[in-house]
Amino acid sequence: MKVLWAALLVAFLAGCQGKVEQVVEPELEPELEPHQQADWQSGQPWELALGRFWDYLRWVQTLSEQVQEELLSSQVTQELTALMEETMKELKAYKSELEEQLSPVAEETRARLSKELQAAQARLGADMEDVRSRLAQYRSEVQAMLGQSTDELRARLASHLRKLRKRLLRDVDDLQKRLAVYQAGAREGAERGVSAIRERLGTLVEQGRARAATVGSSLASQPLQERAQAWGERLRARMEEVGSRTRDRLDEVKEQVEEVRAKLEEQAQQMRLQAEAFQARLKSWFEPLVEDMQRQWAGLVEKVQAAVGASTTPVPSDNH
């Protein structure tokens, strides 16, 4: 009899332990690397649109089970689609803006950079589409399990969304790196333009000297000092004009670079705060469930121990 009780107890405890581990699993979310947290920083329109996409998805996920089942409908999928299209539209617009700044760069370099950026853009779009597909799949499974417990489905959805979130972070990191290469190419093109102006200016100076020598020999009747002064004034005016254009172009490039950097830093801070808020909400979602399961587990163990102790207590004998 004792052997039978022990076997039943072991089987029961093993089943309870498996269930507890299955429910607790969604809470275990790995910490993000520092560079991944920094990726959600920047102030470009496409990154702000991506933030709205993820905020909407997080809003759906944090609702109660009943409200969540009501919202997981075709309307939610349509709204996610609209946010995805907005993100990709803003990203294409920003890419076109950078391509305009790459005009001085060689055609081969422009083609290579454009191809790499398109690949990163496609990966981001595919991962966003995967998020929408996972949500639609969850909706179908919930509808198929009406009247049954959906804790396992919610845990599985949370696990999928956590993995997809990390993939989105990697996509944003890759895109920002590609865009940084674009910006570097724009600066390189501007520097090449300045070098060309300097070379042209040097050529003009040499031509001016040669022409001055020729004119000086042909106009020997004019006073030498008067001719040199007039030619020097014309050359000085020409050099000042070219130098002014060069400075204006350099200032314009510097302003554009500073503006892009400021936007990147601003969005980086926003993305980091969003990531921290998302992590805090996930923790607050699953923490009460874990504590409740632990209390139930402790009570169950006490009851089983009490039952086993009662069954093994020897019965007093009436024989003296």
Curated annotation (Swiss-Prot):
Residues 281-293 are annotated as: Specificity for association with VLDL. The modification Methionine sulfoxide is found at residue 145. Residues 212-293 are annotated as: Lipid-binding and lipoprotein association. Residues 160-170 are annotated as: LDL and other lipoprotein receptors binding. GO terms for molecular function: cholesterol transfer activity; heparan sulfate proteoglycan binding; heparin binding; identical protein binding; low-density lipoprotein particle receptor binding; phosphatidylcholine-sterol O-acyltransferase activator activity; phospholipid binding. The modification Phosphoserine is found at residue 149. This is Apolipoprotein E. It comes from Cebus capucinus (White-faced sapajou).
